[in-house]
Amino acid sequence: LLGYSRQDKKHRGREPISCRLVFDLLKTAGADRIMSVDLHAAQSQGFFDGPVDHLVAMPVLVDYIRDRFSNQLDNVAVVSPDAGRIRVAEQWAQRLGGGPLAFVHKTRDITRPNQAVANRVVGDVEGKDCVLVDDLIDTAGTIAGACSVLKDAGAKSVTVVATHGVLSGPAVERLKNSGAREVVLTDTVPIPEEKRWDGLTVLSIAPLLASAIRAVFEDGSVAELFDTYPEHHGQGFLFA
């Protein structure tokens, strides 16, 4: 997880673009190349004066969900927690067999951090096993609200999937009480035992990073890895 990656643009006057600052600090500290997983906005890699390997955790997460719903994939609907991540949800739906797609319409108060209100579901989720996908869970307000509106819209179940589990403040309690069948995260952010519960699954991102590092240091062709997506479990990764 790249720190301050969500602050990649100004939402109002006099706000800093902290994501650019972090890249500049890494460059000043001596970094020649950056490798990161699921940046909040892929275009922010342009802030760094040097090569950036933007890895995507989707294959690791998709493999797990495919195995989890192996006998009922035809009933899975992929849901984006907001309109801004609908393209990611489309990629998820494609890799899970082309099932239905939906997103949660929400409004956000830009003067207050981590304040968003989930209003309604756009798309048909009634009777569906919903997979709610996001890049990062911080205070879990958005995700908990999305779970609530999905349940109100008739969803059979909701499984929350995200790459980065920051889990700050009330996040754990919100997720426990959200009604989600399961919360699936990766270990890009260490999750201590006191923030774990029975409904949480944490997947290792180590094989993804190891494969990318090997490609870089053995002078392999990173470009050839961009479209790699094996059909069997446990290997491969994507770049963006």
Predicted regions and their residues:
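PRPP-associated nucleotide enzymes
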Residues: 1-240
